[in-house]
């Protein structure tokens, strides 16, 4: 059985490198010691005339996954290597750059570097609450959290307020749910739907809605069907028992009572919350929730940076310099996702927060 690292070990042993003219290594601050050995072997065996290594030690946030940050930093201090710093950011505005610079300069061992922000001033705010209702009414938002548990808390709040959002880059609503709701709504209006839509619809109803042996739609995908046809020929029950005291005609039942398939049933309160808030189920989400680590490489006009910490990161950030440096890098990455506005949120749930960011914010010119 092969582990991931075994591929590197065997590749290094065989020294069967492809012939290259140039060797490019990106995100080099995240490479592990074993991966650096692969780079060394490629440099020796590939015949590459030049090796270009790109990375930013201030964004080295994967030490916990094995990243050898010190190796990357030591390469910049090797006089045999030529350093070409990138001196212009095309993302962050002045106000975000000022804070990000303060955070980066608090890291004890780093490659000294300077870069300019965009000309736009931007905005930087510190808030004592998570403005997850009215504060998100306009614009694109990236809400960044230190841990998966905090992502979960924020997600629950967004669903209560009826916001359509993405989590870790993916919509939290299955498109098939939306297709089923549309299909049932059209049937109730007296319209026809395709066999493909019937298939989706039947998938989201159980035997209390569809007669036994009709659980899978057996019509033709290219044909059209109305509600009466589904009742007469395809097993849709005409009367539905909704509770011990209530039975209703299938023609009078709203989608949120009719569609009771296991996956959809759990999401109905959230789907109804979206609609009550005046939002459309099929709209493109303006809001995304993510951990800081998962957001690396991303950007958004507006970033809400939640500073709550779990005990583990908090303990590491207060016990030793390496822990302080690593946590500073994490929040540096979080802050620099913002293209226009950065909203820094004080601890609201747990016991701990990343306190240095507020010290740096107060000391920004």
State each model region's role:
Residues 341-353:
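Cysteine/selenocysteine-centered motifs that mediate thiol-based redox chemistry or coordinate metal-sulfur cofactors
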